[in-house]
A protein has these predicted regions:
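C-terminal and inter-domain tail/linker signature
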Residues: 1-325
Length: 325
């Protein structure tokens, strides 16, 4: 990994730690023709200026005093390309409506996760996730009161790593990153198996920080109470680490005791049971997903997950976003 790319990204993150207009910050980090993929309702922006005008500037207008805090930041290589990634929160006073969500006139948090393919210190290809349902739940405006599991998990602000070492600034031993990558690759390949072959990869008291619409869970059995019903709602459930011809990870790498991955889409299956209150369509559904993991020794202890739930629900014929004026 080019340390120049790491420094460039850390500078970008640092510039967003305090309120400013962020236009210069955005223009400096992204190329003018960067391919920027964003969760629904944005979906795509071409270049730094379009991303600023479409996403960042309206968010700043709605969230007074907006700034950004990172909880994890890591770099790595995938298929010969340099990547940087991070997850954390945008923070501000929710003063004006945003994408149809009514302002609360209170402090609000918008969780983000992002990946950038880098060339010469600039982002040329990006995938940016926002947990919009989590914000809507916090504002009392999410219209669905169930999750995909036996019960929706905890909803609320998600913490960074319990070890408080998620911002990696100095390249660690490459063998540790390779170990992290191998563990998550093997674990992902064990999902959706009848014998729950994924269990040995996890600590018994693991933390699964899920998207707001799903909720978060502590302990492997409580996680299973979500994961197994979720898998059963989609026949042929399969993820981006497998060569299924339908989904593919755009990135997957490890650094130190952390690993990350993302797919656009990453998971797919035929919807055969009710999902988030919507009747089955018996059609293929595709999920945009990304993850960060932290391991201790040979087991995964924490997992931060994003799913573009709005995009998934649209495929089922339901739009939970309020109409905009």
């Amino acid at each position: 990994m080019n340390d120049f790319d790491r420094t460039s990204y850390l500078d970008y993150a640092s510039a967003m730690r305090h309120p400013n207009n962020f236009s210069n910050t955005t223009a400096t980090f992204f190329t003018q023709d960067a391919d920027i993929n964003i969760v629904h309702p944005f979906n795509n922006a071409s270049g730094a200026q379009a991303y600023f005008k479409t996403v960042i500037e309206p968010l700043q207008t709605s969230f007074e005093g907006m700034y950004r805090r990172n909880d994890i930041s890591m770099t790595g290589k995938f298929e010969g390309h340099n990547w940087v990634s991070s997850t954390g929160y945008y923070v501000g006073h929710f003063a004006r409506d945003w994408i149809g969500i009514k302002a609360t006139q209170q402090l609000c948090y918008l969780r983000f996760g992002e990946f950038h393919r880098m060339e010469n210190g600039k982002a040329v290809e990006s995938y940016i996730f926002f947990d919009i349902p989590e914000l809507m739940i916090a504002c009392g405006q999410w219209p669905i009161d169930i999750g995909p599991g036996l019960a929706r998990g905890h909803t609320g602000m998600i913490h960074g790593p319990a070890s408080h070492d998620g911002i990696i600034q100095i390249t660690p031993d490459p063998s540790e990153g390779q170990k992290s990558l191998q563990i998550i690759t093997d674990m992902l390949g064990s999902l959706a198996t009848k014998d729950e072959a994924w269990r040995p990869f996890w600590h018994d008291n693991m933390m699964w920080y899920g998207p707001g619409a799903f909720g978060s869970f502590v302990g492997i059995d409580h996680f299973a109470s979500f994961q197994i019903p979720f898998e059963s709602q989609f026949d042929g459930w399969s993820g981006g680490s497998k060569s299924n011809g339908l989904t593919k990870h755009f990135v997957r790498y490890g650094e130190g005791n952390y690993a990350c991955s993302g797919g656009w889409p990453s998971v797919t299956g035929v919807n055969v049971k009710s999902f988030l209150g919507q009747p089955p369509t018996n059609e293929q559904v595709f999920f945009r997903v990304c993850d960060w993991w932290r391991r201790e020794g040979n087991q995964l202890v924490e997992n931060w997950v994003f799913v573009d739930v709005l995009h998934a629900l649209l495929q089922l014929g339901y739009d939970p976003l309020p109409p905009t004026t």
